[in-house]
């Protein structure tokens, strides 16, 4: 990518920093995660959680959600201006699970947001530490990506549910900043833009007045983020057209859907980061690990190392398979929901199965679920190898793929052929090549049709032994190419509903 030099690294976005060298980046990311860890330890003390209860992923998620809610200024303002029955705008809380007389019991807790903000700042040297908050948002987003399929959301915006491999980060809040934008998939950006254009079509005043000016700036910014994800000139030129449109409407929606489809073959650059639950950082800090001194990276060996010796528990419903629950959380930790299952399986060292074959529901427990029969189990989050997380979509290779998900978005920088069926994708491109973007559309279709297998395999580094922290001896795995690689293949995963 020609523009590489102007880009800040993901870690810089993550820590809100300007240009830094590798050591400074490692230190500032280390500072960020140790702040999360210190906060978690303090919250466990406040709530008087036992060691076991503090390692429960459901408790971790509740505590993470509380701090995110405490710092959600827009929602806090909204709640204060629109007081709703039974919601105290100044308080936040959620379910905390405790072990009592050999059973798990749910206790609903409430805290002042001000108090939570104080504890968070205190754990982060008095700063707001927005980067740490974004980090938690990305972990929740990665968990959603692994747990739910966004079929309904895709259909609502007029996109094809088979494009789910482009939907990384679709549940990230708008306020997640540059680090959040980096991990959003092409489909996610397209969906946000289509929603915006549809509002403009239905509401005459959407683009008008002082508010409309702000809306327009947001629209152009989102267009630029999406443009930056594309790697070919024609795709970027089409994004310029969409961005410069005087009055965005159906033509722009068509263009965006076309671009999303094209991204199944001409993949966008989407960042992947291993964001772990707060309790994992808490455990490490409590054991005396100094993240800031040692440095930390979200895209290297560090998260694998951390998970190698962290014991995290999860509540398990009566008919769920603990191994499947572990797979779900492992995928979320490494942001691997859209990775080729063969690559994930090789790295993890145990077979990673498609979503439809998992006997497990989401990690969070609804408030109306009966706690009587709940059990808890250790999550198996260790891996056999580690690999560098990628920020590019790579190029693609004509392989057979399935009716479920017709492409993957590589997470790990590992050399492989990419599974998808060219015929399936090209079938989506019949019809409309007229209009002001016709030459670009023709060019994009030509590139997709002429892509040769070697152009479109993913050139990566390979995987590494966990003892090889400097990544000196890449192991290039060989895969059975007849095997299905998609996670949401022919699937019945639950929908994500806000």
From Swiss-Prot:
One of its GO terms (biological process) is viral penetration into host nucleus. InterPro entries: Flu_NP. Belongs to the influenza viruses nucleoprotein family. The keyword Nucleotidyltransferase does not apply. A motif (Bipartite nuclear localization signal) lies at residues 198-216. Encapsidates the negative strand viral RNA, protecting it from nucleases. The encapsidated genomic RNA is termed the ribonucleoprotein (RNP) and serves as template for transcription and replication. The RNP needs to be localized in the host nucleus to start an infectious cycle, but is too large to diffuse through the nuclear pore complex. NP comprises at least 2 nuclear localization signals that are responsible for the active RNP import into the nucleus through cellular importin alpha/beta pathway. This is Nucleoprotein. It comes from Influenza A virus (strain A/Chicken/Hong Kong/YU22/2002 H5N1 genotype Z). GO terms for molecular function: RNA binding; structural molecule activity. It is found in: Virion; Host nucleus. SUPFAM superfamilies: flu NP-like. Late in virus-infected cells, may be cleaved from a 56-kDa protein to a 53-kDa protein by a cellular caspase. This cleavage might be a marker for the onset of apoptosis in infected cells or have a specific function in virus host interaction. It comes from the Viruses. A motif (Unconventional nuclear localization signal) lies at residues 1-18. The gene is NP. The lineage of its organism: Viruses, Riboviria, Orthornavirae, Negarnaviricota, Polyploviricotina. One of its GO terms (cellular component) is viral nucleocapsid. Keywords: Capsid protein, Helical capsid protein, Host nucleus, Host-virus interaction, Ribonucleoprotein, RNA-binding, Viral nucleoprotein, Viral penetration into host nucleus, Virion, Virus entry into host cell. Residues 1-21 are annotated as: Disordered. Homomultimerizes to form the nucleocapsid. May bind host exportin-1/XPO1. Binds to viral genomic RNA. Protein-RNA contacts are mediated by a combination of electrostatic interactions between positively charged residues and the phosphate backbone and planar interactions between aromatic side chains and bases. The keyword Ribonucleoprotein applies.
């Amino acid at each position: 990518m020609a523009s590489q030099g102007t880009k800040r690294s993901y870690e810089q976005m993550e820590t809100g920093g300007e240009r830094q060298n590798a050591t400074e980046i490692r230190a500032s990311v280390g500072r960020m995660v140790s702040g999360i860890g210190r906060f978690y330890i303090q919250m466990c003390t406040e709530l008087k959680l036992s060691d076991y209860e503090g390692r429960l992923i459901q408790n971790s998620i509740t505590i993470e959600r509380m701090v995110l809610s405490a710092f959600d200024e827009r929602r806090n303002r909204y709640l204060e201006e629109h007081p709703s029955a039974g919601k105290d705008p100044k308080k936040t809380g959620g379910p905390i699970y405790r072990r009592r007389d050999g059973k798990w019991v749910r206790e609903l807790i409430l805290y002042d947001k001000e108090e939570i903000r104080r504890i968070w700042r205190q754990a982060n040297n008095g700063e707001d530490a927005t980067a740490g908050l974004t980090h938690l948002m990305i972990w929740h987003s990665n968990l959603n990506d692994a747990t739910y399929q966004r079929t309904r959301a895709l259909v609502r915006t007029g996109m094809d549910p088979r494009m789910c491999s482009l939907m990384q980060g679709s549940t990230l809040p708008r306020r997640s900043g540059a680090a959040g934008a980096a991990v959003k998939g092409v489909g996610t950006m397209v969906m946000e833009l289509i929603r915006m254009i549809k509002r403009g079509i239905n509401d005459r005043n959407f683009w008008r007045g002082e508010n409309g000016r702000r809306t327009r700036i947001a629209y152009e910014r989102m267009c630029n983020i999406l443009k930056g994800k594309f790697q070919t000139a024609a795709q970027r030129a089409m994004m310029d057209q969409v961005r410069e449109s005087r009055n965005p409407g159906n033509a722009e929606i068509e263009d965006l859907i076309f671009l999303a489809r094209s991204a199944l073959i001409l993949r966008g650059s989407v960042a992947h980061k291993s964001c772990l639950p707060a309790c994992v950082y808490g455990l490490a800090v409590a054991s005396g690990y100094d993240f800031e001194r040692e440095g930390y990276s979200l895209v290297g060996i560090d998260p694998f190392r951390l998970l190698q010796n962290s014991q995290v528990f999860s509540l398990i419903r009566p008919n769920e398979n603990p191994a499947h629950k572990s797979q779900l959380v492992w995928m979320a930790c490494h942001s691997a929901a859209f990775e080729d299952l063969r690559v994930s399986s090789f790295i993890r060292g145990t077979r990673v199965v498609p979503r439809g074959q998992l006997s497990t529901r989401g990690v969070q427990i609804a408030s109306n679920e009966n706690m009587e029969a709940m059990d808890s189990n250790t999550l198996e989050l260790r891996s056999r190898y580690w690999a560098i997380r990628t920020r590019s979509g790579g190029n693609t290779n004509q392989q057979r793929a399935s009716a479920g998900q017709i492409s993957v978005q590589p997470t790990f920088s590992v050399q492989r052929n990419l599974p998808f069926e060219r015929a399936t994708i090209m079938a989506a491109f019949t019809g409309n090549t007229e209009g002001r973007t016709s030459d670009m559309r023709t060019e994009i279709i030509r590139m997709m049709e002429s892509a040769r297998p070697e152009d479109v395999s993913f050139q990566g580094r390979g995987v590494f032994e966990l003892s090889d922290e400097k990544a000196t001896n890449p192991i290039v795995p060989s895969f059975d190419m007849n095997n299905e690689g998609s996670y949401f293949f022919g699937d019945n995963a639950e929908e994500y509903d806000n």
